[in-house]
Every structure is written in C-alpha cells, then in structure tokens.
Amino acid sequence: RQMCIRDRWNMGWMNDLCHYLKMDPYFRQYHHKDVTFSMVYAFSERFVLPISHDEVVHGKGSLLNKMPGDYNQKFAGLRTFMGYMMTHPGKKLLFMGCEFGQFIEWDYHKQLDWMLLDYESHRKTKDYIRALNHYYLAHPALWQVEDNWDGFRWLNADDNTRSVITYYRADEKGKKSLVLCNFAASRWEDYRMGVPEAGTYRVALCSEEEQYG
C-alpha cells in the first residue's frame, strides 16, 4: 500500500501573512511584499493555504487577536484577511472558531466559545464567512484554475502607500471576479483601480457592509 499526498501546505504564505497582519497598519506600507510575494511561487506546486490549529495555540493568539487595533478594527482585519485568503489561488484550510472570531486560543480540553454568537460582532463575522463561502462556491473563477497564470492576474500589486492590492481571478471560460483588499486602517474615498475590460462593474460582496461589520 502507498499513500499519495498531492497538496502541500503553503507555510511561506502563512508566515508572511501572519507577520503582516500583526503589524500596526501604518507600518504595513513598508512590508507590502508580505502580501504579494506568495504569487512568485504560487504555481510551482499544488498548495493549501493553512490556518491550522498550530497557529492558534501556544501563545500565538487566536486569529482575531492577531489583528491590531481596537475591538472593531480587529473584526474588520479578520474579514479582510478572510476575503484575501478565499480569493488567493490555493485550497483553503481554516481552523474551527476562526469563522466567528473566537478571542481565546484553541483549548482541546473544552469546546469552542459558542456563546460568543450571542454578540453582534461575532454573529456578523459568521454571516460574512457564510456569504463568502457561498460566493466562492458559486463563482468558478475563484477555484477552477489554480495552477497557472490563466486564473490570476495582478491589477495593481504596488500600492504600498495605501496598503491596497487589486487583482482578478478567472475561470476556464475567462469569466472574471475582481478583488480589492484594503489592509490599511483608513478608508480611501474615490479609489481608482484598473479593470481588465471596459464595462460596468458591480460590487458583489463587501466586508464593510453594515450586515457584516
């Protein structure tokens, strides 16, 4: 008998991103490559993007508590991270409790803190992750082509001063989903981004909608 393991955990992506997300948003402009470098090697192997139990134990803090800022900024950071993770090439691995913003580290001696869902911010986070999962499943652009550049293109990877990245994912028929991730603590009014084709575009999902944050 033999076991064939096809996919590999992308530890480089995870380490770079965790380092970036823990940082004060002002200083992220000087470490912009932490969120872009993974695309240099994204298609060299079949990767899984892992947020595993190892990342939320042993003093590393829960995913929510890795985020800097006040209470609301932590939840906003978590939603931005999840949007980036779900639209980045690679299979996804998210450890239990991260989907509703558990504050404490995972403890195998007890169950998750389900009572947090009685609080609005945690409940809205769960609703956002649900909506994000539904969007992911309904749009093959986010998962159909994950092994070459036909499925991903940067629109702007260099806006480090505003800590913004824009890109699109494409399915086998060329249908695209455009993505904008703002890792700053600021809102950018009238932000201009490039698009691959002329036309009318609509916002399909936004982590800052009132129902989510």
Residue spans for each PLM region:
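Transcription/chromatin regulatory elements, primarily intrinsically disordered
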Residues: 34-38
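Acidic, His- and aromatic-enriched active-site or binding-groove loops in soluble protein domains
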Residues: 7-23
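Acidic (Asp/Glu)-rich catalytic clusters
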Residues: 39-44
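Carbohydrate-interacting/catalytic domains
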Residues: 26-30, 45-47, 54, 59-94, ...
